Amino acid sequence: MQEGLDDGPDFLSEEDRGPRAVNVDLQTDATLQVDISDALSERDKVKFTVHTKSSLPNFKQNEFSVVRQHEEFIWLHDSFVENEEYAGYIIPPAPPRPDFDASREKLQKLGEGEGSMTKEEFTKMKQELEAEYLAIFKKTVAMHEVFLCRVAAHPVLRKDLNFHVFLEYGQDLSVRGKNKKEKLEDFFKNVVKSADGVLVAGVKDVDDFFEHEKTFLLEYHTRVKDASAKSDRMIRSHKNAADDINRIASTLYTLGTQDGTELCKYGLIPGHTGGGQREGRGGKIEARVAADEDLKLADLLKYYLRESQAAKDLLYRRSRALVDYENANKALDKARAKNRDVLQAETSQQICCNKFDKISESAKQELIDFKTRRVSAFRKNLVELAELELKHAKGNLQLLQSCLGVLKGNT
């Protein structure tokens, strides 16, 4: 029953991957192009085949592929975050961990309840769960590809040595997941960072541009988070409506065939008036609406929720550098007043000044690019979603008109 979904591997070829789940308006450079050409699922692991084309002299070949796992993507992301040289850049958000537990649990429950349903019902539910699993799998691959493409499109991060090793080194990178101790350390670091962030947030920025961006991003992140939660509820409602319509359609179809009437051809029921299909056309339309909203809206919101957090992290690093610079100025004044350790204080003050200026210089352009990127992505996806919604609305209208015609005896 679970063949190809749990016990066996799942192979995702180029033609099966479909469009990228999230449009992040990547302005790719032909000198370095990265994509995930294939992916293989083996129980709890997903192996991604990362394909690279490049004319850069840093690489030994112009075209090559390597196999990478999720932990290696996280390692690459963390190496960017921990590198002080990249403190002034928005680090592309790490792709979410592959999670197929819910789909596999549903398949297991389906197998346990096989004896209580007809063969037709079992086959139909199995196909639906397989489709759900494949959709999650495609989305997982797409999010990992988006991360790599964002790095490859960045004028600075694309030159990183770790990124080149990730793309070119043919062997396993020997990267493991974090153990409990490391996860606990990360937790405490985040607690300290959150507390420090509250203190830093109260500092008035010396630059109006960054003060405005800080205020805007706090509000923007909150709004996107709220919109993401509401879009998930909306999509869930469409899916529930599709399931309910299909159940009603199946019941009415059975009733219509049992009492010798043509009831099965009324309402939002079969795909054609001659019967033979138990799945309602109205249900199919609702399911397509849910799928399109998930692809064009929910995924976009989830991505930019993570990207806006990365932008907030950039502003935090700059504010932290500003506070350090101001503290260094105070320490220098005290050293001069006491005429003690002046040279050391001057050196420290100069280091803090250089760090703050360097972060500020790159951060401004990063935030401008982020605005351009998100506006373009939202415009594109919302226009496409509106066009799809119109298409589905017309389909619903035609279906209702057809049903009315049948009920009135016009057809």
Language-model regions, residue ranges each:
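Phox homology (PX) phosphoinositide-binding domain
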Residues: M1-D226
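C-terminal, extended alpha-helical scaffolding domains
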Residues: N179-T411
